[in-house]
Every structure is written in structure tokens, then in C-alpha cells.
Amino acid sequence: MKKVFIRTFGCQMNEYDSDKMLAVLAEEHGGIEQVTQADEADIILFNTCSVREKAQEKVFSDLGRVRPLKEKNPGLIIGVAGCVASQEGENIIKRAPYVDVVFGPQTLHRLPKMIVDKETSGLSQVDISFPEIEKFDHLPPARVEGGAAFVSIMEGCSKYCSFCVVPYTRGEEFSRPLNDVLTEIANLAQQGVKEINLLGQNVNAYCGEMDDGEICDFATLLRIVHEIPGIERMRFTTSHPREFTDSIIECYRDLPKLVSHLHLPIQSGSDRVLSAMKRGYTALEYKSIIRKLRAIRPDLCLSSDFIVGFPGETEREFEQTLKLVKDIAFDLSFVFIYSPRPGTPAANLHDDTPHEEKVRRLEALNEVIEAETARINQTMIGTVQRCLVEGISKKDPDQLQARTANNRVVNFTGTPNMINQMIDLEITEAYTFSLRGKVVEA
């Protein structure tokens, strides 16, 4: 049985793709063994992220560490997948000639054939084309062991924000046909999955073709998935404010399975910076979306992405972001220092903000967000939360870990038969990034 080591960098889309790589290899070889140490593997895969320079360079650092394994075992297969593969292509082979296969997010289904071609010809294989929907036509049926699962409904992005490489590494937006998505979710529900997370670079742009040739938009998809037997909770990742329509907002009013947590990246509270980023909305328009959402879901927890130190960002513009964060009360958000990416329009902008100042802004923004997260956690003490038990706690092997609808991790004492089940937990303690609870007896 082939032993496979895979290291995944970046977003949840990459996590999903890594699972699919393992699935196509398992189908090809009649099963595989996933190992946690590279020196135990027959196949080593790095599924990469190019959103920030640091993540991209780490890939080449990791490749350097496995080079001695290749020298010791020439039959070892080393592969680079994901967005760095799409961006760099043949350059990866030039920089690391011991790499055997390089493939992008849309060609991962071709991995088994690429390995065979490498073994037959002795030549490294590179395939970073964008065949769009073909990938999903060649992936084996989803198999899961947990109570939650990701389902990719669309890929790519056509927004072309000035700082972002995604349209260049994952291609333009394309949506899976409605029936394909529903079949996958129904299959997962039959396997015991309770929670579905609909996945895409911009899920609100979903426009899947229906059997009658009509187009299903994202709000309609949410309503259909809501009625699939066995599915108890629904999430989606990630959205773009420009297409967060009233019909999507109304789903929060009508669909109780849709969790009270939303990740909606804003990036900045400054209209000038948002315009330079080519985001296509203003801070006021973003706040209008949130106002409508909280009018119908007052308990909605909102997380976001922020970039500090974007070229030309002034102290006043950063203060506008800080004020927006306080006004909206963002929770569990992600703050990054701007990282110029080759080939993007923003990479050509003049940047005169010292790195030390960018670090200060990052820390200031994180401080405000973490304070709000801690405040929300404190308000949950004494409440009973419906939670999905994910498995053994990462903090204590004698405890279990569950997740609330608003995306909080709860550690508690339980029994193994609770894993992958929905249970009620009373929250007894709150920390900055997790909660402690106890089982509510029926």
C-alpha cells in the first residue's frame, strides 16, 4: 500500500483539495496509508498557498528539507500542488529539479496519470491548466469520517482585487451544476454528516446550471440544501460584500439551519483604500449589509479579513479601519500585513510605510478584535449551546472538542460515542479563543 505524506498551506479550499488528492490516489492504488512523517512516504505532496510571500517561500524551504530523502530514494515521488504551482509552473522544476510533478488546483484529478507519466518517461510533469469543471467530473464520490464536511460549489474568482493572486492561480469563477452539488451533499448526509460548509472563493457568485437549463443562484441553493434530510447545520466560506444580496440576507431570516456566524471580508475601513484595492464597495455599503443582517439575526457573530499597511495607507485611514472594527464589533477575525504579490496591480504601487508601523497597526487591530472575542465568550457563560462534537480535544487528550453554531471551540468531558454527534453543552468557562462546557443531560 502506497504511503502518502501531504502538507497543506493556506485556505479551506486547499484543505478540501488535499482531501481530494488523497482520494484520487486511493482510488488509483486500491487504498493508501496517510503518514505524518515525510521520511516514511512513497509520495510527498505540498499543497501550496501564494496569497502571501511568507507562505510561498516556506514551500521552497520545505522542499529543501525533503531533497535528501529523494537522493536516498530516487523512486520517491515529490509533488507541488496549489496556487504556488499555478503561479510558478516550470520555475519550480528549475529551482528544485528533484520535484517530479507540479499541478494546479484545477488539475489535481490528473495526479495519478502524472505520476505514471513521470515514472515512465523519467521527466518531471507540469500541468497548471484551467480545465474548469472537468476536475469534479473525475473525482471519486466523497467519503468522510467526521460529522462535518466541506462541499465545493464553485471555484475561481473574477473580482480581480488589486492585491490578490487568486484569479491568476485558480482561474475565473465557475460553478458546479446544481444537481452535482446536491448529490454530493445527500451522499454525505447518508454517511452521517450533520454539518455542511459550502465552499468557494466567492460563494455568493454561485450560478449553477439546473436540469432545465435555468440558473440557480446562491440564495436558492441555500434554501434547497436546507431541506436535505440529515443536514442539521449549514455554513459557507467565503463571501464577497459586493454580491451579498438581499435574497441571501433573507436566508438568515428564513433558514434556522444556517448558523449565526458569517465570515465576510472587508479588508479596510477606508473608502480610498477600498477603491485602491478595487473591492467595489464602500465602508457605508458594507455597514448597510451588516445592519440588515443583525436586524433579523441579532446574535449573528461576524468575522472578517483585514489588510494593514496597504500601499499609501495613512494613519487616518488606519484609524477609520479601527473605528469600523469597533462599530461593527467584529469577532475572531484575521489581520495581515500587506504582502505584495508579483503580477498584481498593487505590487506596482509606491509603499512608503515603515514595516515597524505596519506591525504596530497589526497589533492594535488584533487587540481590539481579541477584546471583542473575549467579551462575546464571556456572555456565553451559563448558556446552553447546540454543538457538533469534532473529536478529541487538542488541549487535553482526556477531553472532547465541540464547535458551537457561532464557531466557538468548546472543550468538555464526554464519551467517545458523542464524537460526530450534535449535543447540548452548558458553557461554564470562557477564554479568549475557546470555551469550557459540560454535557446537558436529557
UniProtKB/Swiss-Prot annotation:
Domain Radical SAM core positions: 143-375
Cofactor comment text: Binds 2 [4Fe-4S] clusters. One cluster is coordinated with 3 cysteines and an exchangeable S-adenosyl-L-methionine.
Keywords for the protein's UniProt record, in alphabetical order: 4Fe-4S, Cytoplasm, Iron, Iron-sulfur, Metal-binding, S-adenosyl-L-methionine, Transferase, tRNA processing
Catalytic activity: N(6)-dimethylallyladenosine(37) in tRNA + (sulfur carrier)-SH + AH2 + 2 S-adenosyl-L-methionine = 2-methylsulfanyl-N(6)-dimethylallyladenosine(37) in tRNA + (sulfur carrier)-H + 5'-deoxyadenosine + L-methionine + A + S-adenosyl-L-homocysteine + 2 H(+)
Residues the entry annotates as binding [4Fe-4S] cluster 2: C157, C161, C164
Domain of life, per lineage: Bacteria
Span of domain MTTase N-terminal: 2-120
GO cellular component, one term: cytosol
Principal location class: cytoplasm
Cofactors required: [4Fe-4S] cluster
First-level EC class: transferase
Listed EC numbers: 2.8.4.3
Subcellular location: Cytoplasm
Molecular function (Gene Ontology), one example: 4 iron, 4 sulfur cluster binding
Name of one Pfam family that matches: Radical_SAM
Domain TRAM: 378-441
Positions of [4Fe-4S] cluster 1 binding: C11, C49, C83
Functional description taken from the UniProt entry: Catalyzes the methylthiolation of N6-(dimethylallyl)adenosine (i(6)A), leading to the formation of 2-methylthio-N6-(dimethylallyl)adenosine (ms(2)i(6)A) at position 37 in tRNAs that read codons beginning with uridine.
Family statement: Belongs to the methylthiotransferase family. MiaB subfamily.
Record's subunit section: Monomer.
Listed name of the protein: tRNA-2-methylthio-N(6)-dimethylallyladenosine synthase
Organism per entry: Neisseria meningitidis serogroup C (strain 053442)
Lineage, highest ranks first: Bacteria, Pseudomonadati, Pseudomonadota, Betaproteobacteria, Neisseriales
